[in-house]
Amino acid sequence: MAADISESGGHDCRGDQRSNTKLDADYPLRVLYCGVCSLPTEYCEYMPDVAKCRQWLEKNFPNEFAKLTVENSPKQEAGISEGQGTAGEEEEKKKQKRGGRGQIKQKKKTVPQKVTIAKIPRAKKKYVTRVCGLATFEIDLKEAQRFFAQKFSCGASVTGEDEIIIQGDFTDDIIDVIQEKWPEVDDDSIEDLGEVKK
């Protein structure tokens, strides 16, 4: 019954998937999966790390890599030189493509690991304590803010990129509390700036 449909339904069924099948293909199909992104090799170009996928394919399956590069070569324009092409590829990598994960961001370790504590006057005899630099030790600021608010029974908020404001003067106690909670922050990396104007 299935043979009758496939023989007669070639022109009449426009939406039928069977009319698009390759006649010379052997079923079941054998699909080559990439060792880097675990997708079929045809889809590697849509992943953010295309270069790694191509290196893997070239190393493990050079004949498939040759087919892939021959198929993609007519798409490239003849007028673009090597230098211009690589700059365009770098810019294209930065932008997230539809459906992909986007560029994987590298963490920067150039910032010195130092926690600074300052007492800032507010109104009359009221003060706030500013703690900066906890993010350089890869401490979650939201978690630290909740911890300080609970520990000192006061309001605390994350205000800047790497800044926590605690309502009240806790400069004496906070150094011990930080070292107790996060032992990776040693005594040498904590600096008390004293009273600082905003």
From Swiss-Prot:
GO terms for molecular function: translation initiation factor activity. Residues 1-20, 72-110 are annotated as: Disordered. The modification Phosphothreonine is found at T86. Coiled coil: none annotated. Residues 95-110 have a biased composition (Basic residues). The modification Phosphoserine is found at S73, S189. Keywords: Acetylation, Initiation factor, Phosphoprotein, Protein biosynthesis. It comes from the Eukaryota. One of its GO terms (biological process) is formation of translation preinitiation complex. InterPro entries: DENR/SUI1_TIF, DENR_C, DENR_eukaryotes, DENR_N, SUI1, SUI1_dom_sf. The modification N-acetylalanine is found at A2. PROSITE patterns: SUI1 (PS50296). Residues 9-20 have a biased composition (Basic and acidic residues). Residues 115-182 form the SUI1 domain. Pfam families: DENR_N (PF21023), SUI1 (PF01253). Belongs to the DENR family. Interacts with MCTS1. May be involved in the translation of target mRNAs by scanning and recognition of the initiation codon. Involved in translation initiation; promotes recruitment of aminoacetyled initiator tRNA to P site of 40S ribosomes. Can promote release of deacylated tRNA and mRNA from recycled 40S subunits following ABCE1-mediated dissociation of post-termination ribosomal complexes into subunits. This is Density-regulated protein. The lineage of its organism: Eukaryota, Metazoa, Chordata, Craniata, Vertebrata. The gene is DENR.
